[in-house]
Amino acid sequence: MKPLLRSHETQYYSLYPDTLNGLHNVFRTIGNSVQSDTVRRLNLGYLDGDNRRGNLAGGLELLRDATTPNASRMNITRPLDTSTSGATAMIMQSLRTDVAENITLLTGDSRATISRQVTLTDFCFPDAEMPGLIILSIRHPLDINSEALYATPAGRDPRVMETVWYELSELAAVSVNRVNGSGVRPSLVSLSFLIAARASDYADKCGAEALRAHVISNYGRRRMEEKLDRFGICLITMLRCRVFPHRHFQLLGGLISWISQREIASITAVVRGPQESIKTEQTAMPRSSVYVPACAYIDFDKDIRVIHEERSSSSLYLVFVYTQKFGRETVRIYVMRSRLGEWAFREGLGYMYSGVRSNNAITGVDGLIVPHGANVNMEFPLTKTLDLRNRDRRLGIAARSRDLNKADWKVDLRGRPTKESCMYAAYCRLGHLDESSVPVKKFERCGSLDIPVIWIPGVIWNIGTWIECY
């Protein structure tokens, strides 16, 4: 929330420039009293010394008279204190109570941004879910097929991508050609559907299979199990063709309300701000909290044993984990809670999935075309280059002429490890939690099934960009 506070602070001071100038004068007056003594301390008040005492009094009077919309509410009402700690407390209290209050009026703690989108309900059926479910948007399959044409490495067929999407289109309203590419399409996918499509890849088999059974029985579609299988095959084929799913799935937000009719729905989600700030229009659940299937939730800091505080401010991350062993690819999606920042979280992922990371570096090139033969330049011709330089130096050939005799090294990178073949995870920031938010595991009744879920109260949506891990 600090970047958000800074942005609104800048907005506030742009509206009231006199306040900023006044505060600058206060700190400039205080800064003039800094003495270059042995302890280098800040002398804010003195019992003696009219000049220094006058500077402090003038600074406090200027702070008291700062022109703000709520200047009359500033908490400098008692006589000026002559002690250093008293003057410091007065300044800090004034800055916190007045400036922070005006910034809060501009931001609004309960203000949030929502998005409404119309979609077909093939991959997201809101009637079977509860408010608070994480919703993702998916790009058009034609974009995925187009990227596969140039992203697929040598030795793998990019046309398989078009084939698996065509097979999925037999069960879902997925456009696979330019003729019927217009109109409403299944542009949203729920986190439950995404996890159920690859339920066999999760360590928590019971929770994943219970979620899959919930999607099959409650989504109200024919041949739902086969649709999940084919969607899961599409994810694996995307990974095999190096069209990574996270590049085509974007976070939309948390489900709030919806209007559905037959196979189409208008879905509203919170994309920025507190999840609980928007009403759900349901009497049974007027406010909603974000929830995640238990099989896909990880308390990151607890698992890697780096921070042991249960109550502290933290962030939520959406993480895609890839295993790229040819013929045994896996795609797992997790929601992880961590107190670490975005870049420190990346190092933690490398520690947690060190096995997956090393296996991808070794087996990520299986099934690719590797050049063979005597003409393959596997190593840099260092010896030949040194021999040419020594010979030219003995013969007295000029440096410009020696450039023509440099060794020509043309390496063939087909079948060599690249950052795409070594990619083991990708994540993006989902939002923030304060220290009072503690996730709770519960069993929720969905139709005739009990599904283990993790309720995460107090989520403040602040979606970031994708960061890839190699």
UniProtKB/Swiss-Prot annotation:
Organism: Gallid herpesvirus 2 (strain Chicken/Md5/ATCC VR-987) (GaHV-2)
Family recorded in the similarity comment: Belongs to the herpesviridae TRX1 protein family.
Pfam families: Herpes_VP19C
Alphabetically ordered keywords of this record: Capsid protein, Host nucleus, Virion
Upper classification of the organism: Viruses, Duplodnaviria, Heunggongvirae, Peploviricota, Herviviricetes
Function in brief: Structural component of the T=16 icosahedral capsid. The capsid is composed of pentamers and hexamers of major capsid protein/MCP, which are linked together by heterotrimers called triplexes. These triplexes are formed by a single molecule of triplex protein 1/TRX1 and two copies of triplex protein 2/TRX2. Additionally, TRX1 is required for efficient transport of TRX2 to the nucleus, which is the site of capsid assembly.
Protein's UniProt name: Triplex capsid protein 1
Gene expressing this chain: TRX1
Main location: virion
Localization: Virion; Host nucleus
